[in-house]
Amino acid sequence: MIGRIRGMLIEKSPGQALVECSGLGYEIDIPYTTFFHLPETGQEVTLHTHFAVREDAQSLYGFASRLDRNLFRLLIKVNGVGPKLAVGILSGLDAQQFIRCVEARDANSLVKLPGVGKKTAERLLIEMADRIGQLEGQFVPSQPDVPTGAGAATASQAGPDPREEAEAALIALGYKPQEAAKAISKVAGPDMNSETLIRLALKNMIPAG
């Protein structure tokens, strides 16, 4: 089991990070809430990880905090929730926001997540109600501990148009192209990078609390 990786961040994009550790490059699937906290490429990063093995694939999932990683492990035990949907859930809501939804039995916020219908939302509320007790002591109002460099990225780098990149990221998460374009248009401002656009769009689409 690979429980944690610390190394140099070589590449990052919404949904994935490439981390070099001891000469090996690890492709790690990450939720957007973790992507937002990654440092600039070339800096050191620590990710709490979950290694999944299937007949047709081996996947490594990375998270900004132990709480996010441990919640992911509980989510994939819910009937009908696989790793992809669990990552999608943690892309729209961070662990603490999700826990608050469960405690408040807030199905309305959950059904706004792509891939989560009414039945899945109700199943999540029922099955996770008892399981979140396993996270006791981890649910604290603190910042994720992922960056060990100078901090999260704040400026866009040369590359694709930020709006197009942000729309593509929302579509990859499961939103329809029209929904993604509308959400980005609502929050777009001058000199915004794709990370900021995605974060603000998700905040509007999935209000927490």
UniProtKB/Swiss-Prot annotation:
Protein name, as recorded: Holliday junction branch migration complex subunit RuvA
Region (Domain I): 1-64
Region (Domain III): 158-209
GO cellular component: cytoplasm; Holliday junction helicase complex; Holliday junction resolvase complex
Entries under Pfam families matching the protein: HHH_5 (PF14520), RuvA_C (PF07499), RuvA_N (PF01330)
Family assignment from sequence similarity: Belongs to the RuvA family.
Domain notes: Has three domains with a flexible linker between the domains II and III and assumes an 'L' shape. Domain III is highly mobile and contacts RuvB.
Purpose of the protein: The RuvA-RuvB-RuvC complex processes Holliday junction (HJ) DNA during genetic recombination and DNA repair, while the RuvA-RuvB complex plays an important role in the rescue of blocked DNA replication forks via replication fork reversal (RFR). RuvA specifically binds to HJ cruciform DNA, conferring on it an open structure. The RuvB hexamer acts as an ATP-dependent pump, pulling dsDNA into and through the RuvAB complex. HJ branch migration allows RuvC to scan DNA until it finds its consensus sequence, where it cleaves and resolves the cruciform DNA.
SMART domains for this protein: HhH1
Gene3D superfamilies referenced in this protein's UniProt entry, alphabetically: 5' to 3' exonuclease, C-terminal subdomain (1.10.150.20), DNA helicase RuvA subunit, C-terminal domain (1.10.8.10), Nucleic acid-binding proteins (2.40.50.140)
Subunit structure comment from the entry: Homotetramer. Forms an RuvA(8)-RuvB(12)-Holliday junction (HJ) complex. HJ DNA is sandwiched between 2 RuvA tetramers; dsDNA enters through RuvA and exits via RuvB. An RuvB hexamer assembles on each DNA strand where it exits the tetramer. Each RuvB hexamer is contacted by two RuvA subunits (via domain III) on 2 adjacent RuvB subunits; this complex drives branch migration. In the full resolvosome a probable DNA-RuvA(4)-RuvB(12)-RuvC(2) complex forms which resolves the HJ.
Primary location recorded for the protein, binned into one broad class: cytoplasm
Encoding gene (name): ruvA
One BP term from GO: DNA repair
Region (Flexible linker), start-end ranges: 144-157
Keywords, comma-separated and alphabetical: Cytoplasm, DNA damage, DNA recombination, DNA repair, DNA-binding
Subcellular location: Cytoplasm
Region feature (Domain II): 65-143
GO MF: ATP binding; four-way junction DNA binding; four-way junction helicase activity
Superkingdom per UniProt: Bacteria
Lineage, uppermost ranks: Bacteria, Pseudomonadati, Pseudomonadota, Gammaproteobacteria, Pseudomonadales
